[in-house]
UniProtKB/Swiss-Prot annotation:
It comes from Yersinia enterocolitica serotype O:8 / biotype 1B (strain NCTC 13174 / 8081). The keyword Transferase applies. It is found in: Cell inner membrane. The lineage of its organism: Bacteria, Pseudomonadati, Pseudomonadota, Gammaproteobacteria, Enterobacterales. It catalyses: all-trans-octaprenyl diphosphate + 4-hydroxybenzoate = 4-hydroxy-3-(all-trans-octaprenyl)benzoate + diphosphate. The chain crosses the membrane at residues 23-43, 46-66, 98-118, 141-161, 165-185, 213-233, 234-254, 268-288. This is 4-hydroxybenzoate octaprenyltransferase. The keyword Membrane applies. Its cofactor is Mg(2+). One of its GO terms (cellular component) is plasma membrane.
Length: 288
């Protein structure tokens, strides 16, 4: 393979794994860090932290690969996804399957350094990552499955740090599911017209004209659950200030999606990175 061909193939692999679009990895990373800090009541063990951070990026990449493989026959009909490596022919189906297996093996190799409880929970994480891309064909609620997939690092984090799954763990998972459904509905609003044409289901289609209201209710539920977690964990004032700031960001997002236009809806989705960040900073500062 010539140098130029290698570079072209490498760029295609990077695009398939979304290395050029880190937003998904960040949205997966923040709940992971929330869980690790809450479970450890402060900075977790360095080895556990490294394993989870690397695992986030490997599993997010694996999720993108299986998502594009599942959507390979429909992505060409959607404006935003038509140029992806699989529908455009830059990566073959066989190459994508090999890449998925490699990424999963790397992730599982990391998990094997943790306790048995975390290893067993990781099997559910793999199942969720595999199932999610296919759910949009059978239900209007694939975003709920995505929320569980993106949040499964929460029980895994508690298991790795404390070998315990307390009430706070499940409340945090529920908060993350509410938040994920809210921001991924914003994301789905970008593709709603295309999805209607090709028969792909989403919460954006299910919610219809009530989309903004339901997103707002989900955002409110996220904040209420985070307040409850703060109370149960006796977190300091910094955490509650971070919740107020997250609420302000949610209000800003509501303004962005008010016209249901593609670009503002996508910017609202991207804005959720700051929500995850400020909530983590609130937890982090509370344990200083």
């Amino acid at each position: 393979m010539k140098g130029s061909e290698f570079q072209s193939k490498w760029r295609a692999y990077c695009r398939l794994m979304r290395i050029d679009k880190p937003i998904g990895s960040l949205l997966l990373l923040w709940p992971t860090l929330w869980a690790l800090w809450l479970a450890g009541k402060g900075i977790p063990d360095t080895k556990i932290l490294i394993v989870f951070v690397l695992g986030v990026f490997f599993m997010r990449a694996a999720g993108c690969v299986v998502n594009d493989y599942a959507d390979r026959r429909i992505d060409g009909f959607v404006k935003r996804t038509a140029s992806r490596p699989l529908p455009s022919g830059l990566i073959s189906e066989r190459e994508s399957k090999i890449l998925f297996v490699v990424l999963v093996l790397l992730s599982f190799g990391l998990v094997l350094t943790l306790n048995s409880m975390t290893i067993w929970l990781s099997l559910a994480a793999l199942a969720l990552a595999w199932v999610y891309p296919f759910m949009k064909r059978v239900t209007h609620l694939p975003q709920v499955v995505l929320g569980a997939a993106f949040g499964w690092s929460i029980p895994m984090g508690f298991a790795a740090v404390s070998e315990n799954l307390p009430l706070v763990c499940w409340l945090l998972l529920l908060a993350n599911i509410c938040w994920t459904v809210a921001y991924d509905t914003q994301y789905a609003m970008v593709d709603r017209d295309d999805d209607l044409k090709i028969g792909v289901k989403s919460t954006a289609i299910l919610f219809g004209q009530q989309d903004k209201l339901i997103i707002g209710l989900l955002q409110l539920a996220t904040l209420v659950l985070m307040v409850t977690i703060g109370w149960l964990m006796n977190l300091g004032g910094a955490f509650y200030w971070s919740i107020l700031l997250a609420g302000a960001l949610f209000v800003h997002q509501q303004k962005m999606i008010a016209g249901r236009e593609r670009d503002p809806c996508f910017r609202a989705f991207l804005n959720n990175n700051y929500v995850g960040l400020v909530l983590f900073l609130g937890i982090f500062i509370s344990y200083l």
